[in-house]
Design a protein with these regions (language model features):
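Canonical positions in the second alpha-helix
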Residues: 44, 79, 83, 115-116, ...
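Short coil turns that delineate tetratricopeptide repeat
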Residues: 49, 84, 90, 121, ...
Length: 371
């Protein structure tokens, strides 16, 4: 590994000197370095064909060279089959976890991650991957069963590796399971270590909302800045406007909700924003309400007309399906507007938190050598 680290540091220095940009920010410029590393790893593998480090890193290099993920997984499966009698359970768990990353979440079960777990994997990445798999299943079917399984794995991951992401993922899944007080404590502890982190402040505002602490929730919301956090760079560190503005709706802060939405409403698909129409109605913003209604009805009717005259369909049946779908959208929209005009109760919306869907590849080149 020392030889590889030395090569990586030399490559990094050479790249940044030549291109005056951070290492690996441009694929075409990075390609020669990945190719050289592949050559180095292949030479090392000839000397020691049973070396797990080399096999796992070789798969990672192939991924960087844009081989298919299936190819990367097959490399490791072949290595495992050829060397299974001389590999420890930890080695096998490591390989299975890496394969689980390459295979992804397309299969009905996370087969290889579960194999790693069955070998008592000591790697946090195994349990992070399992947590992400079951949380994604929860997002798909909104089922408590998958959420509770995800919580179990996120908790295991954070006991092994006490980094930010594992704690955040665990807290986010607790929040989704309505364990607001437990989630709040974790978010508070994280905020003490990562001050002014916008995602944590927003998460705390969500917790306070559902704990009934309206003033605390509003205090946190007032600090949140939308967009990418200036100081942190994970995907969850980017906050969309609606994630903040919808919070004011839940808090019954309707004027603030409408004021905030005014500047961004044109950026979103609003046909199903029942809560927005409801707020316009109860705040007696009838002109804005009917202006939006009339423009939306016109748009939906125009979609139907265009579909009826459009001949760019694969078959008459496909054309009829599109026309039917547009007509159903118009019927649903008009029904929603009538419900609001008739004085429907306040539409409920959800304020969701999501885990950080980051890399859980144990032998990721970028994380292994750049951290």
């Amino acid at each position: 590994m020392d030889k590889l680290k030395e090569f990586w540091q030399e490559s990094k220095a050479d790249y940044e000197s030549k291109h005056n940009t951070p290492f690996l920010t441009d694929y075409d410029k990075s390609l020669p370095y990945f190719e050289k590393m592949q050559e180095l790893l292949l030479d090392m593998q000839k000397e020691d064909k049973n070396n797990v480090d080399v096999a796992c890193l070789l798969a990672s290099v192939r991924m960087e060279l844009r081989d298919s993920y299936d190819t990367c997984a097959k490399l490791l499966l072949d290595f495992l089959n050829e060397n299974k009698n001389c590999l420890s359970d930890n080695d096998k768990a490591r390989i299975y976890t890496n394969i689980g990353y390459y295979i992804g979440f397309d299969s009905s079960t996370p087969e290889y991650l579960l194999k790693a777990e069955n070998l008592s994997s000591p790697y946090a990445e195994t349990y992070k991957g399992l947590g992400l798999y079951y949380f994604s299943e929860y997002e798909r079917d909104n089922g408590d069963k998958n959420l509770k399984i995800a919580i179990k794995y996120f908790e295991k991951a954070k006991t092994i590796s006490k980094d930010y992401v594992n704690h955040f993922n665990y807290a986010a899944s607790l929040y989704e399971n309505k364990k607001y007080q437990e989630a709040k404590i974790i978010f508070e502890n994280l905020l003490a270590k990562y001050p002014h982190r916008m995602r944590l402040i927003l998460a705390l505002s969500y917790c306070e909302i559902f704990l009934g602490n309206k003033e605390k929730a509003a205090f946190y919301l007032s600090q949140v800045k939308c967009g990418q956090d200036e100081n942190y760079s994970l995907s969850t560190d980017e906050i969309s406007e609606y994630q903040v503005y919808d919070s004011y709706y839940v808090l019954d802060e309707y004027d603030t909700f409408l004021d905030n939405c005014k500047d961004i409403i044109c950026n979103y698909y609003t046909d199903d924003w029942e809560h927005y129409y409801y707020t316009l109605w109860i705040k007696n913003k009838k002109d804005e309400f009917y202006t939006l209604v009339n423009s939306t009805v016109s748009k939906l009717e125009e979609s139907i007309k265009e579909a009826e005259i459009d001949e760019e369909y694969d078959s008459p049946d496909e054309k009829e399906e599109y026309i039917k779908s547009y007509k159903e959208d118009l019927v649903k929209y008009r029904a929603m507007i009538k419900d609001i005009e008739d004085g429907c109760k306040k539409p409920e919306i959800t304020l969701n938190l999501y885990p950080e869907y980051e890399c859980f590849l144990i032998d990721c080149l970028r994380h292994k050598f750049m951290d």
